[in-house]
Amino acid sequence: TELVAQAAASGDLSQAQAVFERGRLIAVHCTSQRAEGVGGSQSARLSVDHPAVREHLATLGRALDWHGALVLDYLYDRAEAQPYYIEANPRLVEPMNAVLSGVNLADILAQLSLGRSFAAEPLRVGRFGVRSHSLAATLLGQADGGASRRDLLRLIGQAATRRGVFADSAEDLTPARLDPPSL
């Protein structure tokens, strides 16, 4: 059995979602975690600008001649402007923050799959500073972490009054005002 040891890394849990066309990066969106869901996932996100990550993605996609979606999870050290990569996956993950930021990654991926070429178009990057959340994922994360019923009710109250992590933030998985049955 072989073991791999590495130094601990610190930083903001972040994620980059990208779409490539035959090795060329055509759309990218980065977020950092504002609240934790089950298993440490991002249940609330803030769109961020991580130029080094965009550059690394472009290099990786070109080297692999990647075609389709790719997601990188990483820790981002703000002081050093340095990402520390955790994993990569060939899919999109909860892309609503990207949509709210002006880049519909799922639509771009669908159009690419149907044969549309984006070769003549500039790289699409979402606006920075857009906040989104999933109340359900946040509640599940808090419950999994041992939060009491009172704590969970307090969190629901914050969501209803748009305070705390829910202030200036859009619901991305169950938007009750737009889709009441989603609750």
Regions found by a protein language model. Give the residues of each.
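Phosphate-binding site of ATP-dependent enzymes
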Residues: T1-G39, R45-H56, L75-Y76, Q82-Y85
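Flexible, glycine/charged-enriched surface loops at secondary-structure junctions
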Residues: V4, A69-V71, A119-V125
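C-terminal, active-site-flanking charged/polar segments
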Residues: S101-L112
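Glycine-rich phosphate/pyrophosphate-binding beta-alpha loops
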Residues: R34-R45, N89-V103
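Catalytic core of tubulin tyrosine ligase-like
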Residues: L60
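Hydrophobic alpha-helical segments and helix-packing faces
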Residues: H50-V53, H67, G102
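Peripheral (often C-terminal) accessory segments that flank ATP-dependent C-N-forming ligase machineries
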Residues: Q111-L183
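Conserved metal-phosphate-binding beta-hairpin within the catalytic cores
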Residues: A16-A18, L64-M96
